[in-house]
Amino acid sequence: MDYPPPLPDPADGTIRRYVIVAAEPEGPRYLHLLHGGIGRPDAQQNVPVVQALRQDSRRISDEELVFLLQPGRMPNWRSRLVAAYLIGIDRRTRFRETVGHLLLSSEVCFSGQAYCFALAAFGDHHDAEMLTAYLDRYLPRLDLRYDQHWALGALQYIDLRLGTSHADRYLAPDGMWERWAGAVSHPPAVDNCRDLIVNLCAL
């Protein structure tokens, strides 16, 4: 696929400032966010990382977030992952459509986890619709092991908040989730993803 040229950096060193952040031994920020690491119960060592992430979520400009996301351009999972976390933590709902589109496109690995978190953090009926659109497209694809478990966990979280039942039809016996999860010997546990989303949204 041919992509248009990347968007220019609106500031000097946006990726270094928000995506990399720390050198060894702490390691780059995106590794702390990968697989929801900062939201796991045993992640007490991540407190400074979370504090810095909160500060940066308020500090980063919309222009810098668009630069990190590079919508419609060559994707980078690291910068997209971090951008989506910053968007979700600061509840920047004006990025809702962009995040939903990137999730549905699923152009690159790992960043879908953060899109699901951001939509869960927004927690509105519109976000539930975007997650169901993703699940309707990708749960029938038993050959694709994308972020279906993250999307379903995020949808369960929104159901808990809104008192809705969007996730129920996927979790029915012999339903779409059971068939997708049963296609591999070690399927992901959707309840674990839901609990992780709960922890992440409480940050």
Tell me the role of every PLM-derived stretch:
Residues 73-108:
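Extracellular-facing segments of soluble proteins and assemblies that are Gly/Ser/Thr-biased and enriched
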Residues 47-56, 81-90, 112-124, 145-157:
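Structural detector for internal amphipathic alpha-helices that build alpha-solenoid repeat scaffolds
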Residues 107-116, 139-151, 163, 178-184:
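Boundary/linker segments of alpha-helical solenoid repeat arrays
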Residues 58-70, 92-104, 124-137, 160-171, ...:
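Amphipathic alpha-helical scaffolding segments comprising HEAT/armadillo-like alpha-solenoid repeats
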Residues 1-82, 136, 141, 148, ...:
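Extended repeat-based scaffolds of very large eukaryotic assembly and lipid-transport proteins
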Residues 73, 77, 93, 109, ...:
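Alpha-solenoid helical-repeat scaffolds
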